[in-house]
């Protein structure tokens, strides 16, 4: 009975998870939740300004009674080399022959508020290099080390299926993420690996602060569940479930985490 209770309490025991862009916001919440469920977690970040936040998150995780391990990997995932830099840093910890990754959460992203007349090619590259190419390159870097019955969870957005004024680049990039999710599911499912996406509605974060207030207020007013914003904990719990054994028959799906604002 004790073993069964332990497995239920820590469904991700000894799994290695990578959570990109996890120094703050939803990413940090996901890293914490996966660790709380037993996973060892690699936290990726890009800016030196995020180091203190990463250290605080790692210290918080280290206080969990089951003592999950954490690693911090600094890399710019908008570049063509960033994803491989994350893997190289993990290989330095584990050794090339011993690295086995069980969970990848593609979360790192950026947005830009500009009407189409003002968008430049540089703007396009800034958003798509991280939000789309970055996810693809991270997948390519991880797959050689991905364990059977692996879990890939991509962070999308309700914006992938709704047109919002001034954020066309962000919305289009998230639509691409959803298409990636379905295609990768068809490619990787043979060994029990699942690939899913979570599409949050508005959640308090640095990123949300850049979205026009009228868009956020409209979403709150039209959200059936309590007419409020979501929380990082609510999004992280969905990701935690998708990463675990109970979600083994769910794949190729986009889960709208928006309190009913967007219904798929």
Segments the model singles out, each with a brief description of its role:
Residues 16, 23-25:
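Conserved glycine-rich cofactor-binding loop
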Residues 2-8, 162, 222, 240, ...:
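Short C-terminal tail/terminal secondary-structure segment
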Residues 224-235:
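A conserved structural motif in NAD(P)-dependent oxidoreductases
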Residues 157:
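Residue(s) in the substrate-gating loop at a strand-loop-helix junction
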Residues 139, 173:
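Active-site helix of classical SDR
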